C-alpha cells in the first residue's frame, strides 16, 4: 500500500519513535480476555514477565486472525518462559468480544489464551510508531519487552504480510539467553545450540567448532 510506505518513510521525522534499548511507552487500556472486559497496564508486567506486544490493523479481517490464533495456539510455549502476549488494534472491546465469540471456521478467533487490547483512541499505536495516520489503523508492529520494561526487539510489517510465531519465539529465547554475561547468539541460534563469547578468542573458538 503506497500510503503505508509513505508513512514509514516519514515516521522517524514525525514521531518520537520508541527505539530498541529504550523503555517501552507505558499505557493503560481496556482489553478482552476469557470473554470478559479487563484493564491492562503495560507497566504492571515490569519485574514480572517479558511481553510480546503485537499490533494488527483491524478485527474481522483476513491475515489478522491467522496471526492471532497462531500466537494463541502456541501460548503455552511463551508462558513456560515467563512471557505474556498482548494483541492490540484500534477496535473497541465490543468488537474484540464479538470476534472472540465467533468460531474460527466462520472467520472468528474462538477462545484466546491472551488479552486483546482496545486502542480506540489510537494513542498506543501512535506511541509505538505504528499508526498510519490517514487510515487510522496500525501496521503489523511487534515488540519484545523485557522484565525491566525495555524494548529488546521490534519488527514492523506492511499490512499484507503476516508474522512468524516460530521466529518470534526464537528471538525471545535468544534475548533471554544473552542475559547471561559474556554470551551472544549467532544467526539462527536456537536453544541448545552453540553460542559465542563476544571477543576475538571467543569468535575463533565458535567458528572452529562449526
UniProtKB/Swiss-Prot annotation:
Task: Quickly give the catalysed reaction.
Answer: a hydroperoxide + [thioredoxin]-dithiol = an alcohol + [thioredoxin]-disulfide + H2O
- Do the record's keywords include Transit peptide? yes
Which residues does the UniProt record annotate as the domain Thioredoxin? 18-177
Q: Name one GO biological process term.
A: response to oxidative stress
Could you tell me the superkingdom of the organism this chain comes from?
A: Eukaryota
Q: Beyond the main fields, what else does the record say?
A: The active site is a conserved redox-active cysteine residue, the peroxidatic cysteine (C(P)), which makes the nucleophilic attack on the peroxide substrate. The peroxide oxidizes the C(P)-SH to cysteine sulfenic acid (C(P)-SOH), which then reacts with another cysteine residue, the resolving cysteine (C(R)), to form a disulfide bridge. The disulfide is subsequently reduced by an appropriate electron donor to complete the catalytic cycle. In this typical 2-Cys peroxiredoxin, C(R) is provided by the other dimeric subunit to form an intersubunit disulfide.
Q: What PANTHER family does its record include?
A: THIOREDOXIN PEROXIDASE (PTHR10681), THIOREDOXIN-DEPENDENT PEROXIREDOXIN (PTHR10681:SF152)
Family classification: Belongs to the peroxiredoxin family. AhpC/Prx1 subfamily.
Cited function: Thiol-specific peroxidase that catalyzes the reduction of hydrogen peroxide and organic hydroperoxides to water and alcohols, respectively. Plays a role in cell protection against oxidative stress by detoxifying peroxides. May be an antioxidant enzyme particularly in the developing shoot and photosynthesizing leaf.
Q: What is this protein called?
A: 2-Cys peroxiredoxin BAS1, chloroplastic
* Gene source species: Hordeum vulgare
Q: What is the lineage of its organism?
A: Eukaryota, Viridiplantae, Streptophyta, Embryophyta, Tracheophyta
Amino acid at each position: 500500500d503506497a500510503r503505508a510506505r509513505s508513512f514509514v518513510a516519514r515516521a522517524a521525522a514525525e514521531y518520537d519513535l520508541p527505539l530498541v534499548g529504550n523503555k517501552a511507552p507505558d499505557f493503560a487500556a481496556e482489553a478482552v480476555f476469557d470473554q470478559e472486559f479487563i484493564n491492562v497496564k503495560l507497566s504492571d508486567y515490569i519485574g514480572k514477565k517479558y511481553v510480546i506486544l503485537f499490533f494488527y490493523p483491524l478485527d474481522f479481517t483476513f491475515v489478522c486472525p491467522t496471526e492471532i490464533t497462531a500466537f494463541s495456539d502456541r501460548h503455552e510455549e511463551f508462558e513456560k518462559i515467563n512471557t505474556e502476549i498482548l494483541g492490540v488494534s484500534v477496535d473497541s472491546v465490543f468488537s474484540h468480544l464479538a470476534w472472540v465469540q465467533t468460531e474460527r471456521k466462520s472467520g472468528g478467533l474462538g477462545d484466546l489464551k491472551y488479552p486483546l487490547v482496545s486502542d480506540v483512541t489510537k494513542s498506543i499505536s501512535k506511541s509505538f510508531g505504528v499508526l498510519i495516520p490517514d487510515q487510522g489503523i496500525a501496521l503489523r508492529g511487534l515488540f519484545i519487552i523485557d522484565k525491566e520494561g525495555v524494548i529488546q526487539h521490534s519488527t514492523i510489517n506492511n499490512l499484507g504480510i503476516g508474522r512468524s510465531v516460530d521466529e518470534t519465539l526464537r528471538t525471545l529465547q535468544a534475548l533471554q539467553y544473552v542475559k547471561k554475561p559474556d554470551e551472544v547468539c549467532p544467526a539462527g541460534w536456537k536453544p541448545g545450540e552453540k553460542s559465542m563469547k563476544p571477543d576475538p578468542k571467543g569468535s575463533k573458538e565458535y567458528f572452529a567448532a562449526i
